[in-house]
Amino acid sequence: PLHWVFANLNASKDTIRILADLNKAYPFAETDAEKLEQKALGEINQDIIQRAIDCMSEGRVEDLGKLMNEAQEVFDKYVAPNCPSQLKSPKLHATLADPKILELTYGGKGVGSQGDGSIQFLAKNEECQKALVNYLNANNMPAYKLTIQPKHTIRKAIIPVAGFGTRLYPETRFLKKDFFPVVDKDNQVKPVILVLIEEC
């Protein structure tokens, strides 16, 4: 399971200013700093997202937490310099570096446009998740938890194909119901039995 914790830092930030400053890099970057911002929010971000998807699908929770830390480092290095008045984020960084929080989590990062608004963590387990929520609430940072359980995968499925398909009569006089052609989500015509198997 993924034991997430989200919290409001209860500090101030100006989202409109952040977005206005960061949007200066689009659609065409004019300075080196703007080019780095585009790279960070583009190809580097895409790479981190793909690795995060891989971590989740393979159950590598600790590595997912490290990716959160990496994403925050990339943001701080390449994006934050384009809006220093709002993205120095002292409370965010103090919270991310809190020794008590580091004991309870695999990683953490800011949320959305960043700044001293909200924060998210990946707790090590359910007990750490509860302790982290209590700790953040006690420090005037309202927190809530979200646990995502692993998806149950189907290893075996029974697909009944017996019977005459009376609701499809008279077509079933010429073609068994399990071989009826259907158009799948990719706009390919396949026998209905194949579509059922692919869905399993």
Where are these predicted regions, by residue range?
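Short, flexible coil/turn micro-motifs enriched in small/turn-prone residues
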Residues: 107-112, 158-160
